[in-house]
Amino acid sequence: SLAQLDHGSAARAGLVMSRAARAIERAVGAERVYCLSFCEVDRQLHFHLFPRSRRLLEAYEAATATTGEPVNGPLLFEWARTTFTGGRALPDGFPSVADTCLRIRRALAATAAVGQGDDVP
C-alpha cells in the first residue's frame, strides 16, 4: 500500500510518476494523465499511468453519447480498458503501441538529458 512506504520511498515514487507523466504528456499529447492504483489482482503496489488525449475523449464521448457532459475519468478509463483490450485495434489515426512506447522512451531520455530526471532512480 502507498501508506506503507517510508518518506524517502514515497518521495521517489512521486518523482518517478511526475517524470513519467511529463514524458507521456509530451509523447502522446495527453491533456491529462490519470494515475490509478488498485492493487486488486496483483497485490503489490503499482500504478497505471493512463494518457487521456483530446482524441481519446472524443472517441469515448461518441461511443457513450456523453458529449458536453463533465468528464468522468474512471468511467473513461474503464471504457478504454474494455474497448481496446485483447489486441483490438485502436481507432484510425492513433499511433501504434510500439510507436507510443518509443516516443515515451525518447521523452524520458530528453528529460534526463536536461537534468529533469537526475533525482529519479
Spans of model-derived segments:
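HIT superfamily nucleotide-processing domains
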Residues: 1-121
